[in-house]
């Protein structure tokens, strides 16, 4: 699947094709977001990735909140049949990804160039008109530090490969592909020069690979990267540069698909510049807030706010709201205060040091409650979870919404101690890997086409129907999401009536 050639601007008339990576279970949130925020079309998903077409520029693309990383799509095709062919045959097929369709690569580079050029022009205009005294101090440092952390994590999780030294003997020793002091403007200038059609040989690149499933048993990421890298150098005359390339090529080979793309941003979208100290994953926090139906003028409470990540994400997206964060811990509230100050939201969010089971708020005074209920080895809540929910129920108005992040044990406790539907682990929930909509059942296809992107929630609806309400709190939605080493449930409830009625 080739991207559409770009014109003189960064907004091709028929749109460009992108894909985002997402934490497992967040795909429905991302599908809904790209439709609503980017007016995206041709939206489809596979486990961990959402594909779409949009005419949006970089400024709009940067605003995606439920995505981890954003890529410009070069190709998406069926997987290589590794079980029926030799390793040499597979390596030849890898070379054909470049040699059989070089035009799709040049089209992708053209669109990528146009996106960066227009963004650079807007950035220069913004700096020219801005008062330098009003610039936020420390934001670049925060981004750089977060980028370094994200790079280390990504290298560990995806076993990202570097092109080996055999590709080009004169390549500098492998290191981080971006240094903390590197300026994005220099990259844009280099790219503008390098991707000029008369100067293609000046373009430098590196290849990042990920292999999973049966492919990983046959090929290593290093082998794939070497073959792709050599093919690109021979086809286009590009030069490999592991430390500071103009361009990065990402390739993921699995049992379900083969995907190639170009990272649009060097800093992952999930790495928020406005969050000084990370607590809950920002994408999870935003997804929870997006379920809460926040409207202007509402009172929103996080009674166990920790470092305030949920409130930060909500306040950035829905600013005209009164936010209250509560926590019993001095250190957590101190971290939350630092985060609010760094994000410029100190006047938007009020912090209270109180216990979740003794909230100093009148009954039915809160419109929305969003909270990450602590769990794990450090937190043993047991039956206290029901006491907490009763206090939340008390302060919530009738018709109000509660969105909670729950462990399997907490979720089972709230269901009245019913047996779990199965162990909650990294393979639980809706983790099938359909190769786009062509692998979905008719019912799932209909669900995916809905504006709210509900195929994941639909798979849990049977369990929701059997769940007894906790007092006046009636379950509405339930999404199983990955937190890395473990999974959790984003559960949404509505208050149907006042207790005692």
UniProtKB/Swiss-Prot annotation:
It is an enzyme of class 2 (transferase). It catalyses: guanosine in U6 snRNA + S-adenosyl-L-methionine = N(2)-methylguanosine in U6 snRNA + S-adenosyl-L-homocysteine + H(+). InterPro entries: RlmKL-like_Mtase, SAM-dependent_MTases_sf, THUMP_dom. It is found in: Nucleus. Residues 149-264 form the THUMP domain. The keyword RNA-binding applies. One of its GO terms (cellular component) is nucleus. One of its GO terms (biological process) is regulation of alternative mRNA splicing, via spliceosome. Residues 414-469 are annotated as: Disordered. Part of the heterodimeric THUMPD2-TRM112 methyltransferase complex; this complex forms an active tRNA methyltransferase, where TRMT112 acts as an activator of the catalytic subunit THUMPD2. Belongs to the methyltransferase superfamily. This is U6 snRNA (guanine-N(2))-methyltransferase THUMPD2. The gene is THUMPD2.
């Amino acid at each position: 699947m080739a991207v559409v050639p770009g014109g003189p601007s960064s907004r091709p008339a028929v749109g460009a094709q992108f894909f985002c990576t997402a934490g497992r279970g967040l795909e429905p949130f991302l599908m809904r977001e790209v439709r609503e925020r980017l007016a995206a079309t041709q939206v489809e998903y596979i486990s961990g990735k959402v594909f779409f077409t949009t005419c949006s520029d970089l400024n709009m693309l940067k605003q995606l909140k439920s995505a981890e990383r954003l890529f410009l799509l070069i190709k998406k095709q069926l997987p290589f049949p590794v079980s029926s062919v030799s390793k040499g045959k597979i390596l030849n097929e890898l070379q054909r990804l470049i040699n059989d369709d070089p035009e799709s690569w040049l089209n992708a580079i053209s669109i990528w160039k146009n996106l960066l050029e227009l963004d650079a022009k807007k950035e220069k205009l913004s700096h020219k008109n801005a008062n330098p005294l009003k610039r936020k101090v420390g934001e670049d440092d925060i981004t750089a530090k977060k980028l370094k952390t994200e790079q280390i994590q990504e290298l560990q999780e995806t076993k990202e490969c570097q092109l080996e030294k055999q590709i080009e003997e004169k390549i500098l020793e492998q290191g981080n592909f971006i240094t903390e002091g590197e300026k994005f403007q220099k990259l844009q200038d280099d790219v503008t020069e390098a991707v000029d059609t008369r100067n293609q040989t000046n373009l430098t690149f590196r290849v990042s690979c990920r292999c999973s499933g049966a492919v990983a048993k046959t090929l290593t990421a290093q082998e794939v990267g070497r073959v792709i890298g050599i093919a690109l150098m021979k086809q286009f005359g590009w030069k490999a540069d592991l430390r500071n390339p103009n361009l990065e090529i990402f390739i993921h080979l699995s049992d379900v698909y083969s995907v190639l793309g170009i990272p649009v941003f060097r800093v992952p979208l999930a790495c928020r510049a406005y969050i000084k100290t990370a607590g809950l994953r920002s994408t999870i926090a935003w997804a929870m807030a997006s379920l809460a139906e926040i409207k202007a003028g509402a009172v929103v409470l996080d009674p166990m706010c920790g470092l305030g990540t949920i409130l930060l994400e909500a306040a950035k997206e829905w600013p005209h709201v009164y936010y209250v964060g509560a926590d019993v811990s001095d250190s957590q509230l101190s971290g939350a205060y630092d985060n609010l100050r760094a994000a410029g939201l100190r006047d938007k969010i009020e912090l209270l040091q109180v216990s979740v089971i003794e909230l100093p708020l009148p009954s039915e005074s809160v419109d929305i409650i969003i909270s990450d209920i602590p769990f794990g080895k450090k937190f043993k809540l047991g039956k206290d979870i029901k006491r907490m929910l009763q206090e939340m129920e008390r302060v919530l108005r009738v018709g109000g919404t509660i969105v909670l992040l729950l462990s399997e044990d907490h979720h089972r406790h709230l269901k009245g101690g019913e047996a779990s539907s199965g162990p909650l682990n990294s393979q639980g929930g809706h983790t099938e890997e359909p190769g786009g909509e062509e692998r979905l059942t008719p019912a799932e296809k209909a669900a995916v086409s809905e504006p709210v992107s509900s195929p994941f929630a639909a798979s849990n609806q049977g369990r929701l129907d059997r769940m007894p309400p906790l007092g006046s709190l009636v379950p509405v939605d339930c999404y199983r999401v990955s937190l890395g080493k473990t999974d959790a449930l984003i559960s949404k409830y509505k208050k149907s009536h006042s207790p005692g009625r």
